[in-house]
A protein has these predicted regions:
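Predominantly extracellular beta-rich ligand-binding scaffolds that present long acidic/polar faces
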Residues: 1-156, 208
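A detector of low-complexity, intrinsically disordered, Ser/Thr/Gly/Pro/Ala-rich segments
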Residues: 108, 175, 198, 204-207
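Compositionally biased, intrinsically disordered/low-complexity regions enriched for serine, proline
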Residues: 127, 137-140, 161, 172-175, ...
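Solvent-exposed, low-complexity, repeat-rich "mucin-like" stalks and linkers
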Residues: 151, 155-176
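A broad, low-specificity signal marking well-ordered, structured residues that form hydrophobic/aromatic
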Residues: 151, 201, 211
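Surface-exposed interfaces of beta-sheet-rich extracellular modules
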Residues: 169-200
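Beta-rich interaction/scaffold domains
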Residues: 190, 205-211
Length: 211
């Protein structure tokens, strides 16, 4: 999935919102996932009592509580890998899962994050653990799209430029913003010297005010 998903209430996921049983395998999600008035937000599933395995997530997540890179709430999570940013969340936040069921089976999951733990803020060696980005990108089966990092600059719905970067490094210059009559323009205020996640950035136009 490459399209963004925004839900109004609980259970927003890049592949499935709520999965009571079954299996999701070999999926990728690159679309940002959000809930405006709910929780249970996940890169693959909002909440899952089935199995999620062999999947990859690179996106931004936001919502209330239970927000996770693979699942907001999960049960069986195997060999999944994430590079996610949680932009907004109140409780139960994790790079792999916001939280897991009491009888959960979690194994061989990895992630890269400067500030998140794996499951509700805690990581577990061999089960859900952090690795550096270079290690993440040498994991067997890594998709090409997962390891490619880039900033997409957009103005008035039109892509101005796509700028690649290396994890933890910056970009040399910002692209020129197309002029709009009667407005000043700027890109979002961001630390462009140390970038760790792909994202789309919208030009901000501000009308001139007369004295």
């Amino acid at each position: 999935n490459r399209g963004g998903v925004t839900g109004k209430r609980d259970y927003a996921g890049g592949v499935v919102g709520l999965m009571d049983l079954g299996r999701v395998s070999g999926c990728e999600n690159y679309g940002d996932i959000a809930s405006t008035d709910g929780g249970y937000v996940g890169g693959i599933a909002g909440a899952s009592w089935g199995t999620i395995r062999d999947s990859w997530v690179k996106c931004h997540l936001s919502g209330g509580d239970y927000i996770g890179g693979v699942a907001g709430l999960g049960a069986t999570l195997e060999n999944c890998h994430t590079l996610v940013e949680i932009e907004e969340g109140s409780a139960y936040l994790g790079a792999v899962a916001g939280d897991v069921d009491a009888d959960a089976a979690v194994s061989d999951n990895t992630f890269t994050s400067e500030r998140l733990g794996a499951l509700d803020g805690i990581s577990y060696a061999g089960h859900a653990e952090p690795v550096d980005f270079d290690t993440l990108c040498t994991t067997p089966g890594v998709p090409e799209s997962f390891s490619r990092l880039e900033l997409t600059f957009v103005a008035d719905g039109v892509v101005v430029e796509v700028v690649p970067f290396q994890y933890g490094e910056g970009i040399d210059a910002l692209p020129e913003i197309p002029a709009k009559k009667g407005c000043s323009a700027s890109w979002p205020d961001l630390d462009y010297t140390c970038l760790t996640a792909s994202q789309t950035l919208e030009a901000e136009y501000t009308p001139y005010t007369s004295a």
